[in-house]
A protein has these predicted regions:
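Formylglycine-dependent sulfatase
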Residues: 1-157
C-alpha cells in the first residue's frame, strides 16, 4: 500500500512556527506534522514571487526554464507538456487534490491544471480570490468596515 503524502506549501511564511524554534508561536498541529513527517531545514525558493516559485517547485524546473517570472503567466501556457509533481503522483495511482492557491489560473482556465488533479480544484469565480473560504471573505469584509486606523496595514482581498 502506498504511503499518504501531504505536501504543504505556504506563500510568504517565514519560519515563525514552533517546529522551527519560534517558541512564541503556538502551532501545535503543524509541529506534530513536522515531528512525525519530513521537515526541511534548508529549503530555498527559486524566486521571491509566489507563482513562479510554486511553478518551479511543482514542475521541478527553474524559472529560467519555465519562463515564468510573474503572476500573470500560467505553467501550461509556457510548458504544456511538463509533468508536474502532483501529476506524477496521479499517474502512479494516487488521488491528488488541490486546496488553496496552487497554480495561478485565469477565468479561461478554472480547473487549475486538470492534468495534475484527480478532481477539479475549487474555484471561487474571481481569479485572485478563489483560495479564500466564505468565512475568510466575510472576515475581510468585517475588517474593511472598521475605521482606517483600526484596519490591518496590508488588507488585501
Amino acid at each position: 500500500m502506498p504511503l499518504n503524502v501531504l505536501f504543504i506549501a505556504v506563500d510568504d511564511l517565514r519560519p515563525e512556527i514552533g517546529c522551527y524554534g519560534a517558541a512564541h508561536m503556538k502551532t501545535p498541529h503543524i509541529d506534530k506534522l513536522a515531528e512525525h513527517g519530513l521537515l526541511f531545514e534548508r529549503a530555498y525558493c527559486q524566486v521571491a514571487v509566489c507563482n513562479p516559485s510554486r511553478n518551479s517547485i511543482l514542475s521541478g524546473c527553474r524559472p529560467d526554464t519555465t519562463g515564468i517570472f510573474d503572476n500573470q503567466h500560467f505553467l501550461r501556457g509556457q510548458m504544456p507538456d511538463v509533468v508536474t509533481l502532483p501529476q506524477h503522483f496521479k499517474n502512479h495511482g494516487y488521488t491528488t487534490l488541490s486546496l488553496g492557491k496552487v497554480f495561478h489560473h485565469s477565468e479561461r482556465e478554472p480547473g487549475d491544471d486538470p492534468q495534475s488533479w484527480s478532481e477539479p480544484a475549487w474555484y471561487h469565480g474571481d481569479p485572485y480570490k478563489h483560495w479564500f473560504t466564505k468565512e475568510s471573505l466575510d472576515y475581510v469584509k468585517q475588517l474593511k468596515a472598521l475605521p482606517k486606523d483600526k484596519q490591518p496595514k496590508q488588507l488585501r482581498a
